[in-house]
Amino acid sequence: MANIKQQKKRNKTNEKRRLRNISFKSATKTIVKQVKIAVEQADKAKALANLSLAYQKLDKGASKKIYHANFVNRNKANLQKLVNTILS
């Protein structure tokens, strides 16, 4: 347990940030899963719409340092490859 006053404050803010990040990651995973489901069902319109949302969420996560930039780029590339299978 922290004895220093500032560290106690930091622990509070770190916990708030951790909970916010968990929520954000969960929402991102849900959208990515929706893209994969749309591809399995060969629903082009739904896949493209969800792909756009997934890109937005991943980019936002990278800018807020929730995700590493390489992780985001890799996921975006893999999702695009997946969607391209039903587009062609």
UniProtKB/Swiss-Prot annotation:
Region Disordered: start-end pairs: 1-20
GO cellular component terms attached to this protein's record: cytosol; small ribosomal subunit
InterPro entries to which the protein is assigned, alphabetical: Ribosomal_bS20, Ribosomal_bS20_sf
The UniProt record lists the keyword Ribosomal protein: yes
One annotated GO molecular function: small ribosomal subunit rRNA binding
PANTHER family on file: 30S RIBOSOMAL PROTEIN S20 (PTHR33398), SMALL RIBOSOMAL SUBUNIT PROTEIN BS20C (PTHR33398:SF1)
Function: Binds directly to 16S ribosomal RNA.
Name the UniProt record assigns to this protein: Small ribosomal subunit protein bS20
Lineage of the organism: Bacteria, Bacillati, Mycoplasmatota, Mollicutes, Acholeplasmatales
